[in-house]
Design a protein with these regions (language model features):
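Residues in flexible loops and secondary-structure boundaries
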Residues: 14, 44, 83, 113, ...
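A short acidic, helix-capping loop that chelates divalent metal ions and anchors anionic groups
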Residues: 71-77, 113-120, 156-157
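Active-site groove signature of glycoside hydrolases
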Residues: 97-119, 144-154
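N-terminal pre-domain/capping segments
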Residues: 1-102, 124, 135, 142, ...
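Short, amphipathic alpha-helical segments
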Residues: 84-87, 120, 124-131, 161
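Acidic/histidine-rich catalytic cores of soluble enzymes
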Residues: 3, 24, 33-34, 128-181
Length: 181
């Protein structure tokens, strides 16, 4: 039987909320999976993460994570400082997910989320920088057993991956079993 999941953003607009409340709500409603924004993991204490992890296990809810990468951490950026900062930021998130026994992250995490403030006639350089970054990030995902999924989105969310074909081409250029669409 297919497992069913729901994203906390169905109920919440902010990322800073009572995660335990929604784990229990998802369980009560018959869901098997609850997806959170990944960024708040960086602000949580380990004891709070332990509490969330325990409640999820008690309620038989698998936690998955998603991310719309802040442009300040754009791993496709031509600014090397921003790109390197993005790599470290995403590696820290994957490490925290590993601590939470999280197995899947998805979303726009291969470039800054949102349409760039400029026209992109040729995105190949951005794609190459993103791929270069992802080859580093995916090593951390492999170390923590995390599947790193890329999401094809419309041109107003990213110019890097807009079609299923582009998503497949992207993951095929990363030598890892831990990257998916």
């Amino acid at each position: 039987m297919n497992r069913l999941g729901i994203f906390t953003n169905f109920w919440e607009r902010n990322w800073n909320f009572d995660h335990i409340k929604y784990i229990k709500k998802a369980s009560r409603l018959g869901f098997d999976i609850l997806e959170f924004q990944a960024q708040p993991l960086l602000e949580m204490t380990l004891s709070h993460m332990d509490e969330i992890k325990k409640v999820a296990a008690d309620e038989n809810i698998e936690l998955t994570y998603s991310l719309g990468l802040d442009p300040r951490y754009d791993v496709s950026s031509s600014d090397e400082k921003i790109r390197q900062g993005g790599i470290l930021y995403l590696q820290r998130i994957v490490e925290r997910m590993g601590y939470m026994n999280g197995k899947i992250i998805s979303g726009v995490s291969y470039a800054g989320w949102g349409a760039p403030g400029y026209i992109v006639d040729d995105k190949s350089a951005m794609v190459e920088r993103s791929l270069k970054s992802m080859r580093e990030i995916i090593k951390t995902a492999e170390d923590y057993g995390v599947i790193y999924c890329v999401e094809a989105v419309n041109r107003f969310e990213s110019c890097i991956i807009n079609t299923a074909r582009e998503a497949l081409d992207y993951i095929n250029q990363i030598d890892s079993r831990n990257i998916a669409v």
